Regions:
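A glycine-rich beta-to-alpha transition motif near the start of alpha/beta enzyme domains, typified by
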Residues: 1-158, 166-328
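Glycine-rich ThDP/TPP pyrophosphate-binding loop and its adjacent helix/strand module
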Residues: 162
């Protein structure tokens, strides 16, 4: 009988399953990610596949970093695979490390540097539990013009924030937010996925991670409501949080269009009404792109421990490691 113990927290409503696996081999985090894909995928399946998980299940594997600048290494996964970066999971992990005492709490904000396949990200957790993430450089890749069966021609703005997203501005397209459901947006993402992926491959080396459907709901203060769909075209998943990497990509897009200024806060509201605050704290260059340095934070404490759990796989279980969650 195989068993696996983990800690579960949620950040703004989105779960994070934390498992510790020191000693994952690899000279850098991308090699460690590749090792996990080949040798430790059973961990991902046990923690994100039904019947031991749900469509919202997300995980982070904590291991040793390669860089002397980082405190720990982090590898991210969901039911669709292993990924380079996750903002909500990084923030949830940082909060757990501080609250559990695994990282000594500082008198003010406690700083933690995570090494991820996307790069090193900096987190701080203050005494109230508020967590702030300074993410990897984020930038706009370009636009993809595609046709949908229900809404006609659409412009999808491709932006990177640790993962690559297609940003669909419903205001820009004249789509009434009240007239469209989350299920319809999930179906739309599935329809657009392959077409947008083809455009993305011609513009950058990153694989499309998901779609962010957004609508401006306030100018002062600047607020955006967003639905983030990720996973795969066949099995789209819904982010319950405002998404750290999605908000970073969104910030890069807004900044490139002049909709937000440097150091100006933007409030990002999730599908369930939880919020992240984001702002551009700097400009930088990343490979061939002009990029921004995004800072994403919770307005107050938003990360909570929900479970200390052990999942079990009996040798005669006909479903084995499980099956991918059913679509939205």
């Amino acid at each position: 009988m195989r068993s696996l113990s983990f800690i579960e927290v949620h950040n703004s409503g989105m779960p994070v399953r934390i498992v510790f696996a020191p000693g994952v081999p690899g000279s850098n985090m991308k090699e460690k990610k590749a090792y996990c894909e080949k040798n430790l995928d059973w961990i991902r399946k046990l923690l994100t596949y039904e019947p031991r998980a749900s469509s919202s299940s997300y995980g982070v594997l904590v291991t040793n970093p390669n860089s002397s600048e980082a405190h720990i290494g982090a590898l991210f996964f969901d039911s669709s695979g292993w990924h380079d970066m996750c903002g909500h999971a990084s923030m949830g992990l940082a909060c757990y490390l501080v609250r559990s005492g695994l990282v000594s709490r500082a008198q003010g904000a406690t700083e933690i540097r995570l090494e991820t396949p996307a790069g090193i990200v900096k987190l701080s957790v203050d005494l109230s539990g508020k967590v702030t993430l300074v993410n990897v450089p984020s930038f706009v890749v370009g636009d993809a013009r595609v046709k949908s069966s229900k809404f006609g021609d659409l412009t999808v703005h491709l932006a990177y924030g640790g993962n690559l997203y297609g940003i669909v501005d419903l205001d820009e397209l004249g789509i009434n937010w009240d007239s469209i459901t989350i299920k319809e947006l999930a179906e739309l993402s599935g329809e657009l996925w392959i077409r947008v992926s083809e455009s993305a491959k011609s513009l950058c080396p990153y694989e499309l991670y998901g779609f962010r459907f957004s609508k401006n709901i306030s100018l002062k203060p600047l607020r955006y409501y967003g639905i983030l769909v990720f996973g795969s075209p066949q099995r789209p998943l819904l982010d319950r949080s405002p998404s750290g990497t999605g908000s970073s990509a969104h910030l890069a897009y807004l900044y490139s269009r002049g909709f937000v200024k440097k150091m100006e806060f933007v409030e990002f509201v999730s599908a369930i009404g939880t919020t992240f605050l984001g702002r551009v704290v700097g400009e930088t260059a990343f490979e061939k792109w002009n990029a921004v340095v995004p800072e994403i934070s919770t307005a107050t404490r938003a990360c909570y421990i929900t479970a200390y759990t052990t999942v079990v796989l009996e040798p005669d279980d006909p479903l084995g490691e499980g099956f991918t969650p059913l679509p939205i």
